[in-house]
């Protein structure tokens, strides 16, 4: 999940039982001006329609298939015009006085204000379209055309054709927008990402459309994907050519990092205090790991204990192991009354498609306008068949690790959260998710489920949960320190190896991610804010149950946690 205002990224959205019409309503306030009738509902509806037109890729991901095949204009002039439109919308939002709004509209107003301010921060203050190739990468993923069966494959590939034809123009805009010299870490990320797209278009798309009977469509796809592959390869080569002048200047700097937290998470805490909070949580989890390892692997070093957990593989392989875990996790959530389950839909489990195996596991949740017939799929990547037997075995996670990945992604993590957001009458809450809310909830769910008895009596399961937590703690500290100057990239990499027990390759990847995704502190940041809110709310409501807290927390959509805190206890103060 990227650090932009959160939208349909790595954790996409599920369709509600009754999706809004895919037909475009009579648009009002499409330019960001206050609605003619002065109502908040009309303004919010008009804003959503304006965003769909400005970013048709976002619209397609949300399930608005009248936009299939269209892509946004990323020329500098278009980006500047879009920023001006967002500024105008922000000014219009300021005209809606709290005294004239009901509580639901007031929350939605502040929610939408945050959406706009977050996008403006990344686009105009942090200047990500001009500094960071990663800004573009997640906005180019065509998986919705390939894996979401909202229409027969030929129809979906017609949409993919329009997308592919747009790619050469997009890569030209990306090259024109990026200012040189670029940071080394950004070049590495960009070259890997755009190079991956080049390989995808060249090698992995032809087998997908080979089954088509329509010779004309097949020919057009062949031509378009070849041109897309060339343009991505050329962009990759250009980025590689920038290595000679590359810099180490990836950091936002402490003032901008703090502004990032204020704008994108509504968190205003001195960075020194945040670092102290993060180190305290790291030490808490290391202490818990020592306790678990004293039982699971007595007298062994912590790294050896973690290695023992990783060596115990899921029965039947990763996909079958995950499928079994989902049934058990859902039953555990119900039996323990952890949180309500809004509907009876189930997530499918499948191997990740060959073109999308960069992450070990992810969940694809169709957007809120999508047909309910389009299923949610939890994807797990198998080891590469070209690897050695030892490499394949090492890649398969231990069952203790996989259990909490499944809890994070599905029950009661991202998938269950999506059921709540799509049951919410606010389309704003279904379309935009806050990074710290979404990833914070899913990460919070891992430890909460252990505390409620998941894996009880099995120290191996606790070791699995804690290794996930330690990785997120080191991300938290790396994000702060990489961007404020208290840690080098090499020191971050070392910390991932020594404190999160990552192997050398994963440690390098995790440290690099911190340079181009400074918001990846969101996992631990969100978890800590949710834990604090839970403690404060339960103290004020001593007769309340855990299920009541979770149901109430998830009922607000997925805005920044401080906004939920305001709704639940009356103040944003004391979020951490």
What is each stretch, according to the model?
Residues 1-2:
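Sec-dependent signal peptide recognition
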């Amino acid at each position: 999940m990227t650090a932009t205002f959160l939208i349909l990224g790595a954790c996409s959205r599920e369709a509600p039982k009754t999706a809004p019409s895919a037909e475009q309503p009579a648009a009002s306030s499409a330019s960001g001006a206050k609605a003619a009738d002065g109502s908040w509902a009309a303004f919010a509806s008009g804003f959503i329609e304006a965003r769909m037109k400005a970013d048709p890729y976002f619209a397609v991901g949300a399930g608005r298939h009248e936009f299939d095949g269209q892509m946004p204009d990323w020329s500098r002039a278009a980006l500047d015009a879009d920023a001006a439109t967002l500024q105008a919308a922000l000014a219009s939002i300021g005209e809606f006085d709290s005294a004239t709004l009901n509580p639901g509209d007031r929350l939605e107003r502040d929610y939408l204000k945050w959406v706009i301010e977050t996008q403006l921060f990344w686009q105009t203050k942090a200047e990500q379209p001009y500094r960071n190739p990663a800004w573009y990468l997640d906005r180019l993923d065509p998986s919705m055309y390939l894996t979401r069966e909202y229409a027969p494959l030929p129809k979906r590939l017609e949409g993919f054709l329009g997308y592919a034809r747009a790619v050469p123009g997009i890569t030209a805009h990306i090259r024109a927008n990026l200012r040189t010299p670029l940071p080394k870490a950004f070049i590495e990320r960009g070259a890997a990402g755009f190079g991956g797209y080049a390989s995808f278009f060249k090698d992995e798309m032809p087998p997908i459309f080979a089954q088509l009977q329509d010779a004309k469509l097949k020919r057009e796809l062949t031509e378009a994907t070849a041109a897309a592959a060339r343009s991505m390869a050329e962009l990759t080569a250009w980025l590689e050519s920038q290595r000679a002048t590359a810099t180490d200047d990836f950091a936002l700097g402490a003032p901008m990092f703090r502004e990032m937290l204020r704008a994108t998470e509504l968190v205003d805490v001195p960075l020194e205090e945040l670092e102290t909070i993060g180190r305290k949580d790291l030490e808490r989890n290391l202490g818990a790991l020592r306790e678990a390892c004293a039982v699971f692997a007595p007298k062994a070093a912590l790294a050896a204990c973690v290695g023992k957990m990783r060596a115990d593989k899921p029965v039947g392989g990763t996909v079958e192991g995950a499928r079994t875990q989902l049934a058990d996790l859902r039953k555990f959530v119900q039996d323990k009354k952890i949180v309500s389950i809004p509907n009876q839909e189930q997530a499918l489990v499948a191997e990740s498609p060959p073109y999308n195996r960069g992450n070990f596991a992810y969940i694809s949740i169709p957007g809120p306008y999508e047909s309910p017939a389009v299923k949610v799929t939890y994807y797990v990547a198998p080891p590469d068949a070209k690897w050695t037997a030892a490499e394949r075995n090492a890649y398969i996670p231990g069952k203790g690790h996989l259990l909490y990945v499944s809890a994070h992604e599905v029950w009661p993590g991202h998938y269950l959260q999506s059921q709540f957001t799509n049951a919410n009458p606010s389309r704003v809450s279904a379309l935009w998710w806050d990074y710290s809310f979404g990833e914070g909830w899913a990460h919070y769910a891992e430890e909460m489920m252990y505390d409620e008895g998941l894996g009880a009596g099995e120290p191996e399961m606790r070791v699995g949960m804690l290794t996930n937590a330690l990785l997120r703690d080191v991300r938290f500290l790396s994000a702060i320190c990489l961007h404020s100057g208290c840690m080098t990239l090499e020191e971050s990499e070392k910390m991932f190896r020594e404190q999160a027990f990552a192997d050398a390759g994963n440690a390098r990847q995790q440290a690099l991610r911190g340079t181009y995704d400074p918001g990846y502190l969101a996992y631990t940041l969100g978890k800590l804010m949710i834990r604090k809110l839970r403690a404060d709310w339960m103290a004020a409501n001593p007769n309340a149950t855990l299920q009541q807290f979770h149901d109430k927390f998830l009922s607000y959509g997925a805005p920044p946690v401080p906004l939920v805190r305001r709704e639940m206890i009356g103040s944003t103060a004391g979020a951490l």
